[in-house]
Amino acid sequence: MLLSTYLNWASVLLTIAGAESNIDPWDEVSSFLQGKLRKLDVTNPNAYDMNDNEQDATFYVSMDYHEEEERSEYESVWQYYNENSDQDWHKSVYDKLQVSADQFNNTEAMYKLSQINLWGQYGYPHNKSVAFQYLQKFNDMTSYENSSALFDLAVAYSTGLFGTLPVDVARGLLYFQRSARLGDLKAKQVLAYRYFSGYSVARDVDKALLLYKEIAEEIKKKYSEEQWNMVFPYIESYIVRIPDFDEGLLGKGLSTVPQSVRRKKTTRPPFAGSSNLKPIGDVGYGEVVMQFKFNAGNGNPGSFVISDSEHEDRLVELFYTAWDLYKGTYTRGRDCDKAKRLLLQVYKTYDAEVKYMDNLQKFFYVKSLDLLAHMYFTGEGFERPNVQAALDLFDRSEKILEGAEISRTASEVDKGLISQYYFNNTLGALKHYKKAKESGNAHGILFYQLGKLSEKNPELKIGDPYLYMQEASSQQYLPAQYEFAKMVESNELRKYSVEDITRLYKAFVEENENIMAPHLRLGFSELLGGSSEVSLYAYAQAAEQGYEAAQISAAYLLYQLPYKFDDPPETTIERKTMAISYYTRAFKQGNTDAAVVAGDIYFQMKNYTKALSLYQSAALKFSAQALWNIGYMYEHGLGVEKDFHLAKRFYDQILEHNQKLYFAVKASVMKLQLKSWFMWLNGKELDNISIDQEQESTVVRPFFDRLVQLLKNLSRETRGDNKKKNQHRILKEKKTPSQGIMERFGLQTEDLLTMVCVLIIFAISMFFRTVAPRGQWNVRINGVNIAGGNALGEEGNPENENEEDDENDDEGRARARNNFGFGNNFDVQVFAI
C-alpha cells in the first residue's frame, strides 16, 4: 500500500511537471522502445554462449514469501537505475510513459505500463499492484473492448494476484466471458475448461464441447495444407511440471503420476563416454571432426586409426550433439541452423572414410545422414526444402548399410511422404510405409498417413481408417487428434460419449501450446532467470486455461511442502489458499499426487477434516502415500476417532499397490501393535479418542522433529542468530506451560516402550542367527529353515531328511546335552510380522 501511495504521488508530481508541455511523449517513447529488447528469453539458443556440457534445467525457487522483501527489491532496482548514468533511460522512459498515461490519458501508454509491471519488460522490476492499477484504468478508458486486456484483468480477479487484491472469481468469470465474446482464444479455453470441470460454474459438457471444437477449428486454420497433411511443425513443448525436475511432488518411489519431463538433453550410450568437443571452422557450438590418419608404419590406407588424443567414439557424440540442437531442450531452444552446419561438416569430412569405419561408426554416421536428409526434406535450417538432396542422402545411407538389417523408421516415412505428395505415387508410398510399420517402432505420422490413404483409396484395402487414425491420435500426433475427434463425433456407430469427444478436442487444443499458451515458455524462462513472481503469473494464466501441468507448477511456486526436518515456509494465507485451489484442480484432472499435497497443506493448517477428505479421494486412486496418511490419522485420532484396527487396515492396503514399501509398512504395523498392547495393559480405551482439528497438540509431533528443532535452536543461540525465530519462539513459550523432558522431545511412554520392544526383538533375532548355527539349533523363520540343515533334506526330498535325521540323531542329542543339558533337539521358530 505504501508503495502504491508513493507511485500515485509521483504520478501527480510528474503530471504537474509535465503541464508545461502540450505534446504527448508516447510517440517518442514508443519509437525508442522498439530498439530495446522487450524480454530476454534464456531458453533462446542465442541468448548465451552455452557450451555442450550444459546441465539440465537448474533453478532456485524460494520457499518463503515476504511482501517487505518484494517491496525492498523493487525499490533497490529503481535505486540502481537512478545511481547509474548508463541506465538513465529507464527512469526517463518510465516518467514519460506516466505523463502520457496520466496527463494525456493515452490508453496505449496505460497498457504498456500494465505490461511492463506485469511481466517486468525492458528490465523494469515486476510490480503487481501498479500493473493492476493501470490495467483497470486502461479497461475503463476503452469501455472494456480490448480482449487481451480483459483476459489479464480476469486473471487478476480470479487469482487476486496472490494477495494483491481480494479474489473475486465471479467477476473474473464475467471478464473471461466478455473477452471470449470479443474473440480471445485463451478466454474461450478458460470457459471451456470451467464448463468441463465444473469449476466456478455449473458443469456443462455440451457447452465445453462446443467451445473446444470452436477453438480447435480456429487452430487448424493457422496451419497451411502442406503443414497439416505432410510435415507438421515441430513444437517445443514446455508443458512440464516444475516439481518433476526434483523427482515429483511426493518424491521417488511414492509418486503415482508419470513424469512430465521429456525434452532433457539426450542421454549418451555408455560406450560414448563424455567428449570435449572442439570448434572447427565457423561451425561453432560443439562441432568436432573425428581425426582420421594413415598408419605411418606401412602407409596402407586400409589401416587408418583414430588419433590417440581423441575419443574413439567421437562420431557418436557428434550425432547426439546435432540431435540436441535439432530438437532443443528445456534450457536451450532449437537451433536448426547450427545442427545443419554440424551435420554438413560431418558429411563433408567423413563420407570418403566410410570404408574404414567399423559397424558402430557406420551406424551413427548413417543416423547423421538421415537427420540431415530429413532437414533437407522439411526445409528446417534451410531457406526452402530440397527434396532431391534429401533423396540423395537417403540413397547414400542405404548404400552404406547395404545388407544390414537396421531399422530406419523415420527415413522410410520421409521417403513415403516424398513419394505420396511430390510424385503422387501411392503404391510407392505404401511400400515405404510398410517397411516403417514392420520395424515395430512406427510413429504417429505413419498411422495418420495410412488412415488418410485408406479413406481416400478404399479399393486398395489398406485397412480401417478409423483404427489407423485412433492409433495416430493415441501417439499424440496433433493432426490425427483433430481428425480422430471429428471422426468420432460424426460416427454414430462408435460408442463414444460427449465427454470422451470433449477430451479429444481438449487434448488437441492444449497440445498446440505455441498458439494457446506461449507464456508457458516465458514462465519457464523467467524461472531460469530467477524471476519467480513473473514466472508465477505466467503459469497462473495457463493454469486458468486448464493446463494440469501449469496448475501444479503455479501451486508449487506458491507453496512448497518443507522437507522432513526443515521449518515450514513463511508465506501469506492468500498464497497458501491459492496453492490448495490449484492442487485440487489438478487432482480433478487426474493428478493423484496433487490431492495428497493439498491434504498435507490442510494437515499443517490443523484442518484435519479437509485433509482426511483429500487423502480419502487420493486413496481411491490407489495412492500409497494417501493410504499411509489415513492410517496415521486413525492411529493418532486426528480429526477422527482413534481406531487402531482401521489404522492397520489402511497400512496393510499399501502393500496391495506398492510392494516396495514392505518394510516401512511392517514397521508401522509392528509399532501399532505394540502401542495397542501397551495401552491395553494400562487399561486405556482405544475408541472415542480424537484430537480436535483446532487443538494444538504435541502428541502428533514426532520425536525426531522435536529433536532436530531443538538442535536448530541451540545452533542459533550459539551463533547469536536469534533475532526473528527465537523472538517468535519465546513469545510462544510464555503462553505454554513448562514441559517435561519427554514432552519436550514429543515422546509418550508407549512410544518409548515401543522403541525398546522393537530393539529387543531385533536383538533376539540377531542372537539366534549368530548362535544357532554353532549350537546346531533348528531355526525357522516363517517356516523356512535357516540353520541346522536343509528342512527338506537333499534336493528337497523329505525321505532324505528322515534318513539324515535317523543317522545323526544320536550325535545331535549328545551335542545338545553337552551344550545345554537338554535331551531333545532345541527348536526355535521366529515369525516375521
UniProtKB/Swiss-Prot annotation:
The keyword Magnesium does not apply. Residues 1-19 form the signal peptide. Keywords: Endoplasmic reticulum, Glycoprotein, Membrane, Repeat, Signal, Transmembrane, Transmembrane helix. Sel1-like repeats lie at residues 107-143, 147-184, 185-220, 592-623, 624-659. Residues 796-810 have a biased composition (Acidic residues). Glycans are attached at residues 105, 127, 146, 424, 607, 688, 713. It is a single-pass membrane protein. One of its GO terms (cellular component) is Hrd1p ubiquitin ligase ERAD-M complex. GO terms for molecular function: ubiquitin-protein transferase activity. One of its GO terms (biological process) is retrograde protein transport, ER to cytosol. The chain crosses the membrane at residues 752-772. It comes from the Eukaryota. InterPro entries: Sel1-like, Sel1_AlgK, TPR-like_helical_dom_sf. Interacts with HRD1. PANTHER family: ERAD-ASSOCIATED E3 UBIQUITIN-PROTEIN LIGASE COMPONENT HRD3, SEL-1-LIKE PROTEIN. Component of the endoplasmic reticulum quality control (ERQC) system involved in ubiquitin-dependent degradation of missfolded endoplasmic reticulum proteins. Component of the HRD1 ubiquitin ligase complex, which is part of the ERAD-L and ERAD-M pathways responsible for the rapid degradation of soluble lumenal and membrane proteins with misfolded lumenal domains (ERAD-L), or ER-membrane proteins with misfolded transmembrane domains (ERAD-M). ERAD-L substrates are ubiquitinated through HRD1 in conjunction with the E2 ubiquitin-conjugating enzymes UBC1 and UBC7-CUE1. This is ERAD-associated E3 ubiquitin-protein ligase component HRD3. It comes from Candida glabrata (strain ATCC 2001 / BCRC 20586 / JCM 3761 / NBRC 0622 / NRRL Y-65 / CBS 138). The lineage of its organism: Eukaryota, Fungi, Dikarya, Ascomycota, Saccharomycotina. The gene is HRD3.
